[in-house]
Amino acid sequence: MEFKGYIKEKFPYPKVREPQKRMMLKIYECIKNKRNLIVEAPTGVGKTLGYLIPALYFAERRKRVLILTETIDQQVRIYEDLSSLRHNLKVAFLMGKSNFICKSKGGKANRLYCQLNKKCLYRPNKRPICYCGTKKQPVNLGDKVIYYCPYCTCEYQKAKIESILADIVVMNNSMFYYAKEDIEAKRDIDIIICDEAHKLESSIRNTSTIIINPELPINRLKYMAIHYAPNILKKRLDIGDENFWEIIEKYLTSRGINIDICKETIIFDGENLSSWKYKTELAVLGAILDAYYQINNIKNKILRFNENEEIDREELRFEIDNKALIAIELDFIHKKKLSDLYLLEFIENIKNLRYINENYVVYRSGNSLLCEPVFVSSHLKELYGNAVVIHCSATIGNLKMHALKTGLDKAEFLILESPFPKNRKKIIALKDGVDMKYERKDREKANKNLLKILEAINGNSLVLFKSFEDLDSFYKYLKREITKTNIKNKNIHVYEQGMDGKEAKELKERFEKIGGILLATGRFAEGVDIPGEALVGVVIDSLPFPVPTPLILREQKILEERFKIRGVRDAHWRAFLMTSFDRMARTLVQMIGRLIRTENDYGVVVIQDKRFADWVGRVMREKGYLKDNYEVMSLDMAIKYIPKFMSQFKN
């Protein structure tokens, strides 16, 4: 078989792992026969090379390949792995605009600014000679030709052109949503490979969600008002002053300014603002004040809705009548070299509410209005087009459910075994733990259970919580009680609410270096890779069932109604399994997967929430989410068992 010889030629290491070879051959077979495929390849299989070598094989035979993943770090790793394999293909790496510097205004690039800035000197166009005098390079797009200057064209546009011309394109899921049509301007995509595919559904849902948050544009209006205010007024303005807008209104009316017509008098020539009726700075202030009244009115309407209750689309009659506002914000961000267009984004999102269909659910969350798609499978089917689609992940869980939710009709499945020894990991479910369902949970008892488990592990441990409230409760208890225990390494590391990616990475590195106990929420756990004795215990406080938002309730209701129409028994239970349970199970599998990252790792996973021992673990096994076995023990049994188990492997 030609492809087997190709594997030997391309594989960069002395030996191909058997599961890895199975993965390559199955991907090859499915692409050749134009069949979609979902692969669950646990950590250690060598998943990345498992799909890159088939991708190269077909790309070298004139098939165009798109590789998707979730984060820029993962994109970089895939791009570097591709570069390390011998080939003569064009490979492109496309990130979102915010990762580039805008040459036109300085600062981070912005999608909306780029759309509005039609006269931008740094984008490709139909002129063959650049303003700098350089002869531009042509790009043939079917019956159309555009030209770009290799010296002046902005880096995003260069990356986009490279993606249009490339044989293999690497991008994240959000860019797939926004830019797939653009990169097919010259050639269609034949093969789509999605790595970390368990994140695809939520990524596309988040990208297509409309968020109406009046706080951001109102805050932007305040800073704009201070910027354009005359010096005598500027001295009286303070962002935190509750009379901020009243001061501006009194100032304008005292000078005979008709606030209602200011927005109609503004003229913007692309570079400067002016007014045909008033002094420019006063007309601009009047237009800003008018915009505040309109947006504040929308804010008050939003706050009148009950939180976390679905809103009828007929009640979403919002409108902003202020054409000058976009020009003023463009002028402001250009002068201040800012990147975000909060007002323009707000106006665009208000307009987008008109086009939502029955698939969207709208509700208030905090001060914001969320408009989320219930199902994203139809979005994804459109994006897939006629391509063969391959989904890969270490933890997909229920493959049939994943196929249904991500629009992969008639997909084939491949589940690979972990190459790591199973006897080095033990999953323990406490039968006398606390039932952590919100209205029943006993936080004090759960805290005591967690400390006893940590004392039994007596090694570097990660404790995962459903909420920061639970984390904080245990942190206070642990600080008070840890000195009374025999835990050798008493260092405590805490993942705090609001930490950004950089801070979370530093926390993880500090824990790896110093060791001890790391307290975090489930969100922190996904993607965290801590091999060796740096992590020998994962303790899960509570099962990560999601809060029943209007999105989940609507999804569950629709599915239940469909099951009843089809005469399916236990329709409510089936709908629950496909919604709340599915989200919980996929997250829990990710949590469990934090422990064993290499073949020499060992340790225990202890699930404190007794619902796992009572019924959740059994259902997860039956439905294919959990591939590992687990043992049900009492807390006393676990405390005796864990030290004996750990002693077999400790250095």
UniProtKB/Swiss-Prot annotation:
Q: Which PROSITE patterns match?
A: HELICASE_ATP_BIND_1 (PS51192), HELICASE_ATP_BIND_2 (PS51193), HELICASE_CTER (PS51194)
* Cofactor info, note text: Binds 1 [4Fe-4S] cluster.
Classification via InterPro entries: ATP-dep_Helicase_C, DinG/Rad3-like, Helic_SF1/SF2_ATP-bd_DinG/Rad3, Helicase/UvrB_N, Helicase_ATP-bd, Helicase_C-like, P-loop_NTPase
What positions does the record give for the motif labelled DEAH box? Answer: 195-198
| Names of required cofactors | [4Fe-4S] cluster
Any extra detail in the entry? The fourth ligand for the [4Fe-4S] cluster could be Cys-130; Cys-132 or Cys-152.
> Helicase ATP-binding domain: which residues?
6-255
| Protein name according to UniProt | Probable ATP-dependent helicase MJ0942
For binding [4Fe-4S] cluster, which residues are annotated in this chain's numbering? 102, 149, 154
